[in-house]
């Protein structure tokens, strides 16, 4: 409908963002509203219920389309594959109350700059603002541009100069009031949802509405026992769900409430500094930060001073981060684009803790409020919890489709029932009641709940192993994983790095290695000074805190650290400046100490950090450390040894982490704060290399071997050096012995030359300089005979990945099919890589330590965080054990949960069909099962089986294939259909045979004399003793036969469908389930063979000859044997299904399988020792299936 609306009636909200929505304008119409009200009354409340389930229908029924400018209601539709509708009322804010007190007039608003959204949102002359609130975010109507725009943040177009000029002196009280009214309070309010609201929301679930319908029907038929049982189970289920939701609400409320009531110091333009409650902050306010351990109540841009911040809540990184002020540059470029590095280094994020605030000189640490409330980084995190992206898992969709098939089956049964009972002359109310009964029998209300029981048990088992899950539906997805990406540092390797040695250099090249294991003191000089000062360590309460790498590097120098600012008398010294001094242990030194006066913090994008230090009694120096290639590029070429590349490879190929150091002397005439980073980081002198050990975790190699043996691809995504990554891949087993590694290098276009891509074979040579293997690049023109075998891996850097994506995108899927090592990857590139794998129809898992992996963890089908920080909320799974052992555990439990869901699906489907067939056969005789017979089957049999059947644990061994990912798959459908046919045949045979028995008498309901005689004796003697006549309207020989066949068959079907290996532990290990089956079978056999009249009367059964009871048992046993044989010999016969696929020429339609087949037949792939150039076309690869995401999850 929305597609036909004019442009003024339709727009995009959050265009280009992850939460992009279509928005449609509607105006409420009185007559339509009245008609809906009448319809609600006459439908007895069903119409409002339908509107509750279908929000779009409510809007279409009550409103008429109109332009967004005139709308009083808007309809929202997500643009993703789910197309979820919601509606919001348009709210008006009146500023007229402020006009008299603050001087606001239509012609002269206080916010005079036309570029500000607040000014454009005020409608003149009545001074009103209209807005909508969507997922806790306000969107105001921009009168000039004619669209709804997000409010609560500073405008993106602001330059750094504009921020300093406009907000550097604070806002006036009038501006604060206007912004406060329009932007709303600065609070992340997560109200504790009242129990009654949770209760109503849960009860209005379609599943419970269907149960309510069923219960009402059963009460009308005097089927009170089972109705009460269903009510009891539903009440318990609803109570548990409401309790769980309430606990989550309380937990989230307590998590955020502390940030809503903080007192902060705000500088107001006229009144000066004053204390203010954080709820009253607005974008543009000027914060004054004092003291330490300050909780940030909003996002703010640091404009003066520096701060050390703990951002663990956002990034999972427990290492303090240094924030630097936004420089005041005379440029109109937006401030985010103006910064060479990540603009986040200037931003203090809401929810983080300012450990230390250091003012520049005698001034104060100042920050301008950037975003408030749910617009902040923490607000976005909380919104991702409140409004998670729905899971479009295929299992759920297939279950819905099958439910519709059952509804179709029920419809056929209803028509059959109507015909039989109408022709029999039954009263109309009885006919309707019996027809409705068929629906509750054919469509089991417990099916959706049964599909989740396996997930619940799996979640409990994972919790015992220290793996926590915030998205239980993802457990089933774990069972489908066929590719897992791993971060390197802290995930595959140990998080801590130990200094191994340094390689100094001078004008003659690299010198001898200084090993820290020797115990000798590090030679004093610029290299030692660089290690002692080029870091982001801080001194807090007498303890050195910061990056473990920085800490290890500093400790290796044997220098000491103090915080001082008063006794040095150094110009431009910040308060509590960090000072590093040599101790007595290091002997004579050229300097008394160094004061770190300025930092250019480390950035993963820039791969370096720089500090400016002041020598005590000396000059000013700059020290840089970072990735060797990056540092060398900033140095004077003649100071970089000619053997730099080969020397670097010696260590990186051994798996060492290598950091380069450089320095330069600075002029004293320029203030430190005025020095540009570009000027400082130029013409440096190369000092040498710092070598650090980064060993594999003990668990890494066995886990990777287990995954590879299970044919699950493993991929490394790291920010570390490419050579180091290749070595770690070899040592960990990710690249097996004998497999080739092909280095893919791509370079951007420069000048007249096009972008290029080259392929080089990385080979091994032995022995290496430290008794280990070495690697080198094969640049020979000839290709070895085995160079083009199928066992190879591609390795490339983040830079090459970017160039390939931009200029050689048609090659990208080919590279990804065998791409294993991705080094020097930025956080954004990690997310992009995961998405590219998903486009190839891989089910992708991502395992990282949470530091720079949050984006990739969120993008993957299954994200596993090894961090216990709050940032693990970005990941569905969090492991308390900081190693990758959790990955195979998750996959095993996921496979087990998936198979369990299938088992329960099949069982519930068969259970309903068994009852359905039995009841329809009895309807032919205008009979049915009695209430107690239904109760016995529903409660004593099916409910107990449903609770215990899912208790099988996961198989401890990972097999090299996955369970079926769909309910609508040939083996599963064949299993269900064949078992339904077998049950149908058995019931029909029993129904017909019982009527052909010689003792079958229509007028009598019992053939059991005082002493049970044989059927032949009964046939020979028509004058049988006095027989008891039953008063029940249900008791008949057909009823007794059908009930026994159906009840015992339900037990046997559970045994047949309870799967064990290869994905679950054998059924006999599920002791509770086995015990339940034995007890149920014992009770059923007792009822079958015991002649207890009172028991028969209660269950509305008739006593039959013993031989007929044996016949019943033979029929059920035969059905069980055939069913078990079919299940084992056909359904679970993997070799048979593979042969059938080959016979019919079926091949997987997954994109990665198609590419694998194509590349296997391409003799020219992979290219070796070749260089290709871009034709500048850049044809991109697109997977239509992924784009629509119909089959993705």
Curated annotation (Swiss-Prot):
Pfam families: Cation_ATPase, Cation_ATPase_N, E1-E2_ATPase, P5-ATPase. Its main location: membrane. It is an enzyme of class 7 (translocase). PANTHER family: CATION-TRANSPORTING ATPASE 13A4-RELATED, CATION-TRANSPORTING ATPASE-RELATED. Coiled coil: none annotated. PROSITE patterns: ATPASE_E1_E2. GO terms for biological process: intracellular calcium ion homeostasis. Residues 220-224, 423-437, 923-933, 995-1036, 1093-1105 are lumenal. This is Probable cation-transporting ATPase 13A4. It comes from the Eukaryota. Belongs to the cation transport ATPase (P-type) (TC 3.A.3) family. Type V subfamily.
